[in-house]
């Protein structure tokens, strides 16, 4: 009984911290506040369309960036509360169009030829890893995505 109450209370605290603080920090309705930013999980788009959507909807902001462990945990909790198991885009992408993989092979030689089946220059979060590690995904596929913006 005591453990059940403790778990229920813990889930309530997480839910309130993700959903209730948005209004307190001048986030738009439904957006969640964390460390000076507002975050929202949207329905599926390709990586490029998701980034354009975030820029348009979020006054020039972008897909969510994850610069430290605390934010990674916040984003993972936000995605977990807002979805069934799935993949979600974040704002990470390989910008060098010529380079699919690492710039060097394990023997130290430079990558001058690639034979990769799919374009995996975009990154997202995977439910299989608890949404806490980044996975390379095909940019042209549509997944849910997390936008970030500054409070109003």
UniProtKB/Swiss-Prot annotation:
SMART domains: CLECT. One of its GO terms (molecular function) is toxin activity. It is found in: Secreted. Residues 34-148 form the C-type lectin domain. GO terms for cellular component: extracellular region. Expressed by the venom gland. Disulfide bonds join 27-38, 54-147, 122-139. InterPro entries: C-type_lectin-like (IPR001304), C-type_lectin-like/link_sf (IPR016186), C-type_lectin/snaclec_domain (IPR050111), CTDL_fold (IPR016187). Its main location: secreted. It comes from the Eukaryota. Keywords: Cell adhesion impairing toxin, Disulfide bond, Secreted, Signal, Toxin. Residues 1-23 form the signal peptide. SUPFAM superfamilies: C-type lectin-like. Belongs to the snaclec family. Heterodimer with the beta subunit (AC W5XCJ6); disulfide-linked. Inhibits human breast cancer cells (MDA-MB231) migration and proliferation, as well as their adhesion to fibrinogen and fibronectin. This inhibition may be due to the binding to receptors of the integrin family, probably alpha-v/beta-3 (ITGAV/ITGB3) (40% inhibition of cell adhesion) and alpha-5/beta-1 (ITGA5/ITGB1) (by comparison with lebectin). This is Snaclec lebecin subunit alpha. It comes from Macrovipera lebetinus.
């Amino acid at each position: 009984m005591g453990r059940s109450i403790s778990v229920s209370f813990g889930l309530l605290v997480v839910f309130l911290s993700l959903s209730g603080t948005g209004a307190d920090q001048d986030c738009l309705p439904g957006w969640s506040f964390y460390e000076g930013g507002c975050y929202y999980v949207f329905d599926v788009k390709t990586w490029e369309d998701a980034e354009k959507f975030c820029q348009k909807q979020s006054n020039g902001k972008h897909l969510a960036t994850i610069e430290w462990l605390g934010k990674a945990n916040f984003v993972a909790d936000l995605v977990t509360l807002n979805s069934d198991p799935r993949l979600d885009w974040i704002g990470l992408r390989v910008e060098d169009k010529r380079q699919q993989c690492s710039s060097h092979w394990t023997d130290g030689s430079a990558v001058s030829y690639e034979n990769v089946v799919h374009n995996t220059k975009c990154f997202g979060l995977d439910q299989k890893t608890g949404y806490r590690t980044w996975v390379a995904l095909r940019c042209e596929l549509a997944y849910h995505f997390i936008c970030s913006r500054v409070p109003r």
